[in-house]
Design a protein with these regions (language model features):
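Extracytoplasmic gate region of multi-pass secondary transporters
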Residues: 40-44, 226-256, 270-321, 418-429
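Glycine-rich segments within core transmembrane alpha-helices of 12-TM secondary carriers
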Residues: 148-171, 407-429
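Low-complexity, proline/glycine-enriched hydrophobic segments characteristic of transmembrane helices
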Residues: 248, 423-522, 554-564
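Helix-loop-helix hairpin linking two adjacent transmembrane segments in secondary transporters
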Residues: 156-263
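Central cavity-lining transmembrane alpha-helices of secondary-active solute carriers
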Residues: 63-78, 321-334
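Extracytoplasmic
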Residues: 21-55, 138, 297-307, 421-422
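C-terminal ends and interior cores of transmembrane alpha-helices
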Residues: 94-112, 354-367
Length: 564
């Protein structure tokens, strides 16, 4: 595998006559995932009220959306080149349909435990279907458009923010305004599901370069090697420990079991690849994408947390729609940025990391709605190109891996969001908010502190707020704001004047905790910027960024070490 001797001109020419149809079929597939995820997030409160779930139970159901996706995309990516794209599409469509039947089964007459199982497994299967579709769509589009992967993968992934916008608007109108039953709302994701099923039906799917060359699974894994597998196995070990721990109740034993499973998987990859260390470049890309998952998927909830506390709930929804709409629009512009402005994919990533860092720092200083729109616009531009452009770089540089590398990369990003991004930011919020209130008003902190400390990886335990107590204060603020709005008072800060001194102290400390959390979070894209800058220097040193293509081994030069 060698770089092409001349940097090919960016071209939209596809390798198959039905390429555009397959592209838009993949678009609808990920759109279905976005619509379903947005609506599902909006009806969690409905499930809590109707079935009496605790916040912890709802959190576990939501977490099934991360775990299911990871299993779908990693397993799908490993077998994709061997069984073909078509069979995986059929499997994903069947899983989407099955998830709907399971999720719609609960009724108020059932026992809570029965309803919980239905919703958990319905969410899990929905996520497995989403992951399976990404295991198809990412390598399929990369194969169809080999000379402009960055552009077309960005178009493909524009469907995710589009789905979030559509799902959020539908949820706002049908739930908040019209009070429709949650089952009717959730059923709407079946519309784009039927759409991608129709568009994929009867289509011929091309084979990847690796599949065309007849590479074995072991050969496809060689660039991943022990280094790349180590990233995945460590994340899987942490994830499995977190899932099994509540069932067994023995943290040390569970942690040992999780890392044992991760170790077995790592050894299996070693045997398959004859213990090849893999590409250092791909290892670096995997680590960078771990950070992408943490900052892109893990951060949004905390930005919404700040906006939801500073402004009205409706204004918070508009800000979320604003950032998603920016992402959707800009993902159609990757070709212009690469072709007209002369940015390489790695150059795009460097710029985006800097913007994301600046945007998070601006978001931490939000004081008015106008400032919020500006700050979140900068952050949205920054995070727009991370995910699809990272997939494009991995696909450009490692065609021998077929669907494996980019599917593992997607799994790494999602696992990172679920076990590092969201939990890490939650820990930071607990730590900063608790420390702030304890310093400013120890008596109020003693009243509002959580019954047990928060833990995260190797960091010291931190005591935050009791979720129920601070939640009552936040709900009170939203109720007062709604009442004031009906009298013509639209200043969100006016509601804070009606809180008791103790409530105001706790509420303000929570806001300060949110702000400090976003500042701490900005170190992630700052680290990413340094990694991407090093990659930019590396590619400059070897003559510039170029895609590579599989060539016969006899024609390949023999480098001293594998780097990329």
């Amino acid at each position: 595998m060698t770089p092409t001797t001349n940097n090919p001109e960016v071209s939209n020419v596809a390798i198959a006559p039905n390429a555009k149809r397959l592209l838009w079929a993949g678009f609808f597939a990920i759109l279905a995932a976005g619509v379903g995820a947005a609506i599902r997030g909006g009806i969690l409160d409905n499930w809590g009220r109707e079935f009496g779930f605790t916040g912890s139970q709802l959190g576990v159901i939501t977490g099934a959306g991360f775990s299911g996706f990871c299993f779908g995309i990693i397993i799908g990516g490993v077998i994709c080149d061997k069984i073909g794209y078509g069979k995986l599409v059929v499997a994903a469509f069947a899983l989407h349909a099955l998830s709907a039947f399971i999720t719609f089964a609960p009724s108020s007459a059932m026992a809570q435990s029965t309803v919980y199982n239905y919703l958990f497994w319905g969410t899990f299967l929905f996520a497995v279907a989403n992951g399976t579709l990404e295991a198809v769509a990412n390598p399929l589009v990369a194969t169809l458009f080999p000379n402009n992967r960055t552009h077309f993968l960005n178009i493909l992934h524009a469907s995710w923010p589009a789905g979030l916008v559509i799902g959020s608007v539908l949820g706002w109108v049908l739930d908040d305004k019209l009070q429709w039953n949650w089952k009717i709302q959730l059923a709407l994701f079946l519309i784009p599901t039927v759409g991608y099923g129709i568009m994929f039906f009867g289509q011929h799917f091309p084979k990847s370069e690796a599949s065309q060359k007849g590479l074995s699974l072991g050969e496809m894994f060689k660039d991943v090697g022990m280094l790349g597998a180590l990233v995945v196995c460590v994340l899987l070990a942490i994830f499995l420990s977190g899932i099994i721990a509540p069932l067994i109740g023995k943290p040390e034993a569970v942690r040992t079991l999780g890392y044992t499973i991760g170790g077995v998987l790592l050894i299996a990859v070693g045997i398959m690849t004859r213990f090849s260390m893999g590409s250092i470049l791909l290892f670096v890309l995997f680590v960078a994408h771990l950070l992408v998952g943490a900052v892109e998927l893990g951060t949004d909830g905390w930005i919404q947390n700040i906006t939801g506390n500073l402004f009205t709930s409706e204004q918070g929804k508009w800000l979320f729609i604003w950032t998603s709409a920016i992402m959707f629009s800009l993902r159609f512009c990757a070709n212009f940025i690469e072709k007209k402005l002369g940015f390489s994919p790695v150059g795009i990533l460097v710029t985006c990391a800097i913007l994301a860092c600046v945007g998070l720092n601006l978001a931490s200083r939000i004081s008015s709605l106008a400032v919020a729109f500006m700050a979140l616009a900068v952050y949205a531009v920054g995070k727009t190109f991370f995910w699809p452009t990272m997939l494009a770089v991995a696909s450009d540089r490692f065609p021998r891996t077929g669907a494996i590398a980019i599917s593992m990369m997607g799994g790494i990003g999602m696992l990172s969001a679920g076990i590092i991004g969201a939990p890490g930011l939650g820990y930071a919020k607990d730590r900063f908010a608790g420390e702030t209130l304890q310093k400013e008003n120890p008596a109020v902190f003693a009243e509002y502190k959580a019954p047990s400390p928060s833990h995260f990886l190797f960091f010291a335990p931190a005591t935050g707020f009791d979720g129920k107590k601070i939640g009552e204060v936040q709900q009170k603020v939203q109720t007062i704001r709604a009442d004031l709005a009906r009298t013509g008072v639209t200043d969100p800060q006016a509601a804070l004047q009606k809180l008791t001194p103790e409530e105001r102290a706790a509420f303000d400390a929570g806001i300060k905790g949110d702000r400090k959390t976003l500042v701490a979070d900005s170190f992630i894209p700052a680290t990413m910027a340094l990694i991407y800058l090093c990659l930019l220097i590396y590619f400059k040193a070897i003559g510039g960024y170029r895609p590579v293509h599989i060539v016969p081994v006899a024609e390949q030069p023999q480098p001293a070490a594998t780097v990329g």
